[in-house]
Amino acid sequence: TFAHAYEASLNYSKKLNHGEAVILGMKTALSFSLSLKMLEKRDYNLILNHVNNLNLSISVNKFFTKKNLNKILFFMAKDKKNKSQKINLVLLKKIGSPQINNEYSKERLKKFFNDYLS
């Protein structure tokens, strides 16, 4: 959901390719999982270190700022996997244990992104 919103908010331009969007989406999902206290800091650091060791040197702040927030949230809310007014996300409880959650409002995600997009 995060990756799709990133791609869509840039109109699927060559500025951000699909693989980069997926990596950014994974990093965002990890950070959101950590912010919800679903994921332990130790697991977060292990995964993030592994991703960073791929030498992709990609950061969400390279492509997005708080100015992009409403557009990102618009595309997240439009995702076909959502139910009712809640945004459906795949988050991580621990390494190897993803969890599908359908309980996040645009307001909750906006609060997260206000800190995340610094």
Language-model region placement:
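Active-site segments that bind and position negatively charged phosphate/pyrophosphate groups
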Residues: T1-K67
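C-terminal charged capping/lid subdomain of soluble metabolic enzymes
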Residues: M38-S118
